[in-house]
């Protein structure tokens, strides 16, 4: 059961990109053919918020067809009795190529293809009996998505990705106020 939870949490981390994301866009006063020029998009992943994982993303357009998306996640929840721990420090970058006619759309709206890489450290203990701690995890893959403007400074993004995740972890159990190492292993996931 604990291994299933561990796999589920890692799967959730990898595929939370399938969420709708609220995007706040700063746009310049200049417009070309009724489109505004996006200078910077500040974003938040709503699925991470539902999982109590504070996060922020910044997307920077690079020319008409390209953009760079940088994200950071940092849930750091634990109790003092060694009964619960939900800690993740993660960052990643994604290069995006925007498809379609860029003359009739904003620079960060419509369909896109992307390639991402991310990494971080984690410690998950959902039950007192066992937990999993990793000094690192690394993931990389490709994405497809669509951004739909809702208002002048608001849009929603949907994306789906497939990739590879690699991590070395230590399984532990809590004994009083101490954590006792039980075993260690490697985990590889494609999905």
Regions found by a protein language model. Name each.
Residues 24-77, 82-90:
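Short glycine/proline- and aromatic-enriched beta-strand/turn motifs that initiate or cap beta-hairpins
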Residues 151-191:
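Predominantly the C-terminal beta-signal and adjacent terminal strand-loop region
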Residues 46-50, 72-78, 92, 97-99, ...:
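Transmembrane beta-strands of outer-membrane beta-barrel pores
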Residues 56-60, 70, 93-97, 140-148, ...:
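Residues on the lipid-exposed face of transmembrane beta-strands in outer-membrane beta-barrel proteins
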Residues 36-40, 50-52, 85-91, 109, ...:
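Residues that define the transmembrane beta-barrel architecture of outer-membrane proteins
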Residues 1-35:
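Cleavable N-terminal export/targeting peptides
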Residues 27-38, 65, 100-110, 150-156:
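Short loop/turn motifs that connect adjacent beta-strands in outer-membrane beta-barrel proteins
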Residues 40-44, 68-70, 109-117, 138-140, ...:
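Transmembrane beta-strands of outer-membrane beta-barrel proteins
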């Amino acid at each position: 059961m604990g291994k299933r939870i561990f796999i589920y949490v890692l799967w959730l981390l990898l595929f939370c990109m399938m969420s709708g994301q609220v995007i706040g866009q700063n746009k310049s006063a200049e417009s070309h053919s009724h489109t505004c020029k996006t200078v910077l998009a500040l974003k938040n992943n709503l699925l991470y918020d539902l999982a109590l994982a504070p996060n922020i993303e910044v997307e920077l357009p690079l020319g008409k067809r390209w953009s760079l998306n940088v994200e950071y996640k940092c849930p750091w929840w634990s109790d003092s009795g060694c009964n619960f721990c939900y800690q993740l420090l993660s960052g990643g970058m994604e290069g995006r190529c925007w498809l379609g006619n860029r003359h009739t759309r904003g620079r960060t709206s419509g369909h896109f293809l992307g390639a991402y890489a991310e990494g971080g450290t984690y410690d998950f203990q959902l039950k007192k009996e066992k937990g999993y701690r990793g000094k690192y995890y690394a993931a990389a893959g490709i994405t497809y998505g669509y951004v739909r403007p809702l208002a002048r400074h608001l849009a929603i993004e949907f994306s789906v990705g497939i990739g590879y995740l690699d991590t070395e972890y230590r399984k532990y159990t809590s004994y009083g106020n101490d954590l006792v190492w039980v075993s260690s292993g490697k985990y590889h996931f494609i999905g």
